[in-house]
Regions:
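C-terminal accessory extensions appended to soluble enzyme cores
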Residues: 226-251
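A short, structured active-site edge motif that brings together acidic residues
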Residues: 26-30, 102-107, 198-202
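PAPS-dependent sulfotransferase catalytic core
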Residues: 1-61, 68, 204-212
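C-terminal/domain-terminus segments
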Residues: 30-35, 174, 247-251
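Broad structural signal for hydrophobic residues in well-ordered alpha-helices, predominantly aliphatic
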Residues: 15, 65, 89-90, 158, ...
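Short helix/strand-capping connector loops at secondary-structure junctions
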Residues: 215-230
Length: 251
């Protein structure tokens, strides 16, 4: 669980070196659970409220979705810790919930977005009639967008009653101390450490599939083959209005 452009794809590329692990792309499983749950609000269901039968399906979503995946451990990438999502999962996911949170400062996330959409014409923020950087960033921060959902999920995960479910890693440490960070993840999961490599990294791929970034914009999920922490000059382009509105958001 992490904000977009916070090292999700890098983390997945690293952890998936272990053949027993599958860290997924952006997952649709939580959307499946939500849509099934919302069926209970429909007139058809209310007319014949067979909760048990629908609950049977919801109890089985994850087992069915990952039925043909060969890996022993699956890290499903979704905003599981929003209050609504967590309530559904606590009822229907029949295993302990463990959540890995990657945190990157929000202003660095937005600077990464700026660098991407200012240099990539196909980037989705360029497709909605938004002309200025401020307009594009405000669109990204929409309350129904991925950034907002992940922020809500992370905020909820940090509540005292849920902290035991979560393990927080910082983007900067993932890049500069990857072995130490991955060791902490294995310890959190209670799994024996696997020797990873940290140079000449592969692009994300799982079960023969990779992202089709023609949907959201080229290079949205492209990672560098070598890890290094760099200053992003595009951070200077973040409008003051955005800083005033969101700059206070910290871990």
């Amino acid at each position: 669980m992490a904000l977009p452009r916070s090292g999700n794809t890098l983390f997945a590329s690293l952890i998936n070196q272990n053949p027993n692990f599958a860290c997924t792309a952006n997952s649709i499983t939580m959307e499946i659970m939500k849509d099934l749950f919302l069926l209970k609000q429909t007139d058809v269901f209310k007319n014949f409220p067979d909760h048990k039968s629908l609950d049977n399906i919801m109890d089985s979503v994850y087992d069915l979705y990952y039925k043909d995946w060969s890996q022993q451990y699956i890290i499903d990438r979704s905003p599981v810790m929003t209050p609504g999502n967590l309530a559904v999962m606590q009822r229907h996911f029949k295993q302990p919930i463990k959540c890995i949170i990657i945190w990157r400062d929000l202003m660095d996330v937005l600077a990464s977005y700026i660098k991407w959409f200012e240099n990539e014409p196909t980037a989705f923020p360029n497709k909605y009639g938004k002309n200025t950087i401020e307009e594009k960033l405000m669109m990204l921060m929409n309350k129904d967008g991925a950034v907002a959902k992940e922020l809500v999920a992370i905020q909820n995960a940090l509540q005292p009653q849920y902290k035991h479910m979560s393990h927080i890693i910082k983007y900067e440490e993932l890049v500069t101390q990857p072995k130490k960070i991955l060791q902490s993840v294995y310890e959190f999961l209670g799994i024996e450490y696997y020797p990873h490599y940290f140079h000449n990294l592969n692009q994300f791929k799982i079960n023969g599939l990779n992202y089709d970034d023609t949907v959201v914009g080229n290079n949205m999920h492209t990672i560098k083959t070598e890890m290094r922490l760099e200053d992003n000059p595009y951070k200077k382009l973040i409008p003051q209005s955005i800083i005033n509105k969101y700059g206070h958001i910290k871990l």
